[in-house]
């Protein structure tokens, strides 16, 4: 479950601008602020099922965006490559540049 939550959080970070304000609100509250479906439904005065359906559709949309754009998978690859590169050298200046590259993401 934690792996799924972590993945959805990353996908949300990458693709949230492609979502509607309502989708962003539900996802932020559910995944980032740890609201329950019931709490979200009370705040927006909709059924718990409506919130659940919206979140599930949004998750599917995020996965669809990732299938097409690969932003998250490329990010993961960059992180792994930078870690390998860091292990290959003890040069302080190279480590500083590696950190600068990491900070760009």
From Swiss-Prot:
Top-rank taxon, per record: Bacteria
Pfam family of the protein (one): UPF0122
UniProt record similarity statement: Belongs to the UPF0122 family.
Function: Might take part in the signal recognition particle (SRP) pathway. This is inferred from the conservation of its genetic proximity to ftsY/ffh. May be a regulatory protein.
Protein name: UPF0122 protein OB1530
Organism: Oceanobacillus iheyensis (strain DSM 14371 / CIP 107618 / JCM 11309 / KCTC 3954 / HTE831)
